[in-house]
């Protein structure tokens, strides 16, 4: 089957590889030519992923029968609706359903209206004085969020990016003046984790949990990035997530899909819940309407079921099953020096792919072009897969000497020490549990 993949990052390289492994004939449209995808694809179109007209032209030219949407920006523009109107079924939510990610105020009011478990106290404001008096009355630390897509970089939390609620009010005022409205939520203390599922609008199939490292530098310091790496465990859980917590988080995602269906906006594709595990259980921080990047790179190499079959099940409303190999994974992203604030661009990197293969690791290309020139964002994801976390981390780390260029990475991603730190943090927040093996 001819499948069009929209997007050209590390996440999309992992999707493309899984589609080809599952029997698809792959065609790609993205704004730059990803060297990994270029080898897998029968045809490659260069266009902005949000240029719906151009994407449709390529879809027609390649004669594709199915599309798979990688990033969130084209979903917001209604790419799935446009493809389906032109007779091409697509893996991804409609523009309206994608509002779970693209409109944070929509997502929170939807959860409230449908009594979805894992809700937070929130308010949406358009008026500066009302916002200021509510924050004063609330009296507890808050989180300030822009309403739309921010690439994970516009959210600010009191005690982290914001000193106190006074600073939160100033930032919220800035957003109201810029965007016309702002979302303010209670701050939840805990440890974050990623829960991704496949859904056809009715059935929900879970993937292994993952945890990412959003800060640029070691020990969770520095600016927030798209994610400097992530890990997953062989049992599909995480050391600090109990089976009960897992079931509660899954119930949040199932209830979401069911409520979307009942409201007449069926959600199909990948739904990704970013959860905060608090003392009282999992709380939904935000929805994402697509795979995580890097978290897609943890789970897709483990998928034993054909991704093409899963994709067909999603668009046909007949999702059957998704089996994953029981292995631990560690993904480390190599990013240009200076990322994310002032990244090096236009410089070439050298990759010894043969040596990478010999150490048993995998590589996924991201913000790098066909000439191996850095484009300014996270460039290459290296992945270790093994029975234990330690071995997976060792494999991922052993790739680093075989990639030469003006790059940096977080050495602590997926290390036992960093995972133990998260377990300790959870205990400090008053959660009583016996850590799962990883």
Swiss-Prot record:
The keyword DNA-binding does not apply. It catalyses: 5-phospho-beta-D-ribosylamine + glycine + ATP = N(1)-(5-phospho-beta-D-ribosyl)glycinamide + ADP + phosphate + H(+). Mn(2+) 1 binds at residues 274, 286. Mg(2+) 2 binds at residues 286, 288. Residues 108-316 form the ATP-grasp domain. Its cofactor is Mg(2+); Mn(2+). One of its GO terms (molecular function) is ATP binding. It holds the Pfam family GARS_C. Mn(2+) 2 binds at residues 286, 288. This is Phosphoribosylamine--glycine ligase. It comes from Thermococcus gammatolerans (strain DSM 15229 / JCM 11827 / EJ3). Pathway: Purine metabolism; IMP biosynthesis via de novo pathway; N(1)-(5-phospho-D-ribosyl)glycinamide from 5-phospho-alpha-D-ribose 1-diphosphate: step 2/2. SMART domains: GARS_A (SM01209), GARS_C (SM01210). GO terms for biological process: 'de novo' IMP biosynthetic process; purine nucleobase biosynthetic process. Belongs to the GARS family. Keywords: ATP-binding, Ligase, Magnesium, Manganese, Metal-binding, Nucleotide-binding, Purine biosynthesis. It comes from the Archaea. Binds 2 magnesium or manganese ions per subunit. The gene is purD. Its EC number is 6.3.4.13.
């Amino acid at each position: 089957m001819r499948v069009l993949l929209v997007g050209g990052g590390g996440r999309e390289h992992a999707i493309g590889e899984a589609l080809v492994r599952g029997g698809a004939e792959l065609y790609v449209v993205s704004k730059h030519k990803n060297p990994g995808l270029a080898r897998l694809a029968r045809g490659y179109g260069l266009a902005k992923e949000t240029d719906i007209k151009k994407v449709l032209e390529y879809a027609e030219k390649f004669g594709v029968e199915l599309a798979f949407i990688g990033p969130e920006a084209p979903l917001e523009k209604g790419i799935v609706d446009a493809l389906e109107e032109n007779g091409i079924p697509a893996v991804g939510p409609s523009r309206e359903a994608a509002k779970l990610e693209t409109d944070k105020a929509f997502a929170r009011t939807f959860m409230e209206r449908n009594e979805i478990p894992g809700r937070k106290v929130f308010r949406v404001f358009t008026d500066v004085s009302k916002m200021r008096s509510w924050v004063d009355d609330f009296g507890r630390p808050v989180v300030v969020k822009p309403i739309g897509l921010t690439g994970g970089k516009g959210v600010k939390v009191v005690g982290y990016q914001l000193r106190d609620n006074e600073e939160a009010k100033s930032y919220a005022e800035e957003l109201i003046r810029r965007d016309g409205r702002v979302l303010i939520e209670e701050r939840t203390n805990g440890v974050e984790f990623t829960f991704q599922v496949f859904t056809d609008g009715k059935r929900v199939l879970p993937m292994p949990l993952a945890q990412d490292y959003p800060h640029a530098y070691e020990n969770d310091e520095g600016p927030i990035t798209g994610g400097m790496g992530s890990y997953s465990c062989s049992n599909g859980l995480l050391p600090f997530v109990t089976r009960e917590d897992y079931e509660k988080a899954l119930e949040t995602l199932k209830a979401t899909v069911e409520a979307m269906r009942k409201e007449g906006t069926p959600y199909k594709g990948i739904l990704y819940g970013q959860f905060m595990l608090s003392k009282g259980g999992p709380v939904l921080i935000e929805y994402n309407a697509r795979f995580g990047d890097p978290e897609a790179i943890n789970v897709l190499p483990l998928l034993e079921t054909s991704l093409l079959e899963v994709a067909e099940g999603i668009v046909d409303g007949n999702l059957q099953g998704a089996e994953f190999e029981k292995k631990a994974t560690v993904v480390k992203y190599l990013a240009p020096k200076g990322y994310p604030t002032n990244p090096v661009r236009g410089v070439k990197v050298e990759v010894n792919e043969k040596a990478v293969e010999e150490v048993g690791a995998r590589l996924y290309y991201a913000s790098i072009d066909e000439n191996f020139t850095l484009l300014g964002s996270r460039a290459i994801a290296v992945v270790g897969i093994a029975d234990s976390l330690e071995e997976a981390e060792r494999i991922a780390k052993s790739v680093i000497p075989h990639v030469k260029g003006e790059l940096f990475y977080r050495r602590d991603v997926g290390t036992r020490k960093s995972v133990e730190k998260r377990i300790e943090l959870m205990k400090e927040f008053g959660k009583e549990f016996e850590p799962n093996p990883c």
